[in-house]
């Protein structure tokens, strides 16, 4: 009797272990497949979202490109006609910034004395003009507030030098720049202002 019970107990334990191992294996396989399916779904969703946002970003970049190129044409025309004064340019930039929600900042920067020959008169007149008096205001819009600050010592910065040296449209890689105290990830689209083959500045 004891031997029979012992044998039965051994069989029971053995069968139970087999069932447990089998169940565990099945659970592991199901879990593994579930993880795999979840990962595939995540990749598919990420791919779908990347396509969606890439189209949106491309559309916004194209809109910003058209706006910057249009401003460059307007400023070039004003300069050629002798009608480009600083107040007019500042007003155009402010109005454009308020009307274009996809743009957070505008910059128009000229070579020394290439706008009106009056850099010395405007030297140190902050916040529009820096120590040199060059026309290079950086207009930004953040939380509905427009702000301006002068750009200085920018001749070798990639966004300025790129357009100047190539003589054509220049697009920077995305970079962080502080706008009204807040770091913002942005891309600059820069157009050179060239008159009679002479580079005189940029619109960005």
What feature does the model see in each segment?
Residues 182-204:
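Conserved beta-strands of PAS-like sensory domains
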Residues 98-183:
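Extracellular/periplasmic ligand-sensing ectodomains of membrane signal-transduction proteins
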Residues 56, 71-74, 78, 92-100, ...:
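Structured segments of extracytoplasmic/periplasmic soluble domains
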Residues 1-5:
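Short, Lys/Arg-rich, polar N-terminal cytosolic tail immediately upstream
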Residues 46, 62, 80, 105, ...:
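Short linear functional motifs in flexible/disordered or boundary regions
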Residues 7-15, 19-87, 92-95, 102:
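Juxtamembrane extracytoplasmic/periplasmic/luminal helical "stalk" adjacent to the first N-terminal
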């Amino acid at each position: 009797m004891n031997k029979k019970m012992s044998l039965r107990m051994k069989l029971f334990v053995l069968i139970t272990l087999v069932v447990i191992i089998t169940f565990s294996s099945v659970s592991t396989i199901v879990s593994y497949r579930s993880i795999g399916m979840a990962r595939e779904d995540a990749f598919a969703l990420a791919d779908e979202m990347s396509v969606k946002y890439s189209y949106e970003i491309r559309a916004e970049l194209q809109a910003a490109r058209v706006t910057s190129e249009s401003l460059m044409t307007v400023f070039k025309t004003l300069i050629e006609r002798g009608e480009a004064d600083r107040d007019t340019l500042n007003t155009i930039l402010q109005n454009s910034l308020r009307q274009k929600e996809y743009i957070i900042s505008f910059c128009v920067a000229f070579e020394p004395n290439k706008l009106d020959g009056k850099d010395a008169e405007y030297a140190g007149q902050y916040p529009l003009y820096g120590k040199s008096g060059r026309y290079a205001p950086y207009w930004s819009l953040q939380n509905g507030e427009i702000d301006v600050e002068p750009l200085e010592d920018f001749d070798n910065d990639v966004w300025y030098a790129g357009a100047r040296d190539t003589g054509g449209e220049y697009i920077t890689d995305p970079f962080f720049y502080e706008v009204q105290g807040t770091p913002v990830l942005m891309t600059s689209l820069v157009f050179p202002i060239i008159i009679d083959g002479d580079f005189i500045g940029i619109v960005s």
